[in-house]
């Protein structure tokens, strides 16, 4: 499964350079140069990491950090020219996970990205939830050691829910993350796949949030 990163940087040259470097490392990168656009993208998609500048048009990095952190625990790396103690302390007080000042070495940035992803579990070789073991590299799910006959889409939906355990994912987020931006289907597509997925699981671990979406409980 690909790792998806939201990159928010208003300097076009830096933004393009970082995006290209991360893409070369096989990360999927959504890049934007405006704070308001970043806000929209964050709620329309699911990301395993956010790289966030502070000085941005629209909402600034500190505002976005507070907003994003109030929603979930997605790792957030601040990437900014502001090297003073006050801005760093402010960011860490708002629960930023790391803080990198410009200029920086691209290889060091990549190592910091890898460290945050490893710490969050996004680079895990397997995920365990209840009686299930998910193996992302092989798109396989085992229940008490026995493989379940999930389709590729069913596996991707289950993994997405596991990676966001405790967070409600809307129909729109699931559609865009699993089927992509250009998919013409609607919420019924998600509903059908969830129904089929539930029928193959040993117990109903997927909770429906009526009118919103689906969630895996944090306690699993």
Swiss-Prot record:
GO terms for biological process: cell wall organization; regulation of DNA-templated transcription; response to antibiotic. Residues 124-218 bind DNA. It comes from the Bacteria. The keyword Transferase does not apply. Keywords: Activator, Antibiotic resistance, Cell wall biogenesis/degradation, Cytoplasm, DNA-binding, Phosphoprotein, Repressor, Transcription, Transcription regulation, Two-component regulatory system. GO terms for molecular function: phosphorelay response regulator activity; transcription cis-regulatory region binding. Residues 4-117 form the Response regulatory domain. It comes from Enterococcus faecalis (strain ATCC 700802 / V583). Gene3D superfamilies: 3.40.50.2300, 6.10.250.690, Winged helix-like DNA-binding domain superfamily/Winged helix DNA-binding domain. InterPro entries: CheY-like_superfamily, OmpR/PhoB-type_DNA-bd, Sig_transdc_resp-reg_receiver, WalR-like, WH-like_DNA-bd_sf. Its main location: cytoplasm. May be phosphorylated by VanSB. May also be dephosphorylated by VanSB. Pfam families: Response_reg (PF00072), Trans_reg_C (PF00486). The keyword DNA-binding applies. CDD domains: REC_OmpR (cd17574), trans_reg_C (cd00383). This is Regulatory protein VanRB. GO terms for cellular component: cytosol; protein-DNA complex. It is found in: Cytoplasm. Member of the two-component regulatory system VanSB/VanRB. Activates the transcription of vanSB, vanYB and vanW in response to vancomycin which results in vancomycin resistance. The modification 4-aspartylphosphate is found at residue 53.
């Amino acid at each position: 499964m690909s790792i998806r990163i939201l990159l928010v940087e208003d300097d076009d040259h830096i933004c393009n350079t970082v995006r290209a470097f991360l893409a070369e490392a096989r990360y999927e990168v959504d890049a934007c140069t405006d704070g308001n656009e970043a806000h929209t993208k964050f709620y329309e998609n699911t990301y395993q990491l956010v790289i966030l500048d502070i000085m941005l048009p629209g909402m600034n990095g500190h505002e976005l950090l507070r907003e994003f952190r109030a929603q979930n625990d997605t790792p957030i790396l601040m990437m900014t020219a502001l090297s003073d103690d006050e801005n760093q302390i402010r960011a860490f007080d708002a629960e930023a996970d790391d803080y990198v000042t410009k200029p920086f070495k691209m290889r060091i940035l990549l190592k910091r990205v890898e460290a945050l992803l490893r710490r969050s579990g996004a680079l895990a070789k397997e995920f365990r939830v209840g009686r299930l073991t998910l193996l992302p590299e092989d798109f396989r799910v085992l229940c008490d050691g026995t493989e379940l006959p999930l389709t590729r889409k069913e596996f991707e939906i289950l993994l997405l829910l596991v990676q966001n355990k405790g967070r409600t994912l809307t129909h729109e987020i699931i559609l865009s993350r699993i089927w992509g931006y250009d998919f013409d289907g609607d919420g019924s597509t998600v509903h059908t796949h969830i129904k089929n997925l539930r029928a193959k699981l040993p117990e109903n671990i997927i909770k429906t949030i009526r009118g919103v979406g689906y969630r895996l409980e944090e306690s699993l």
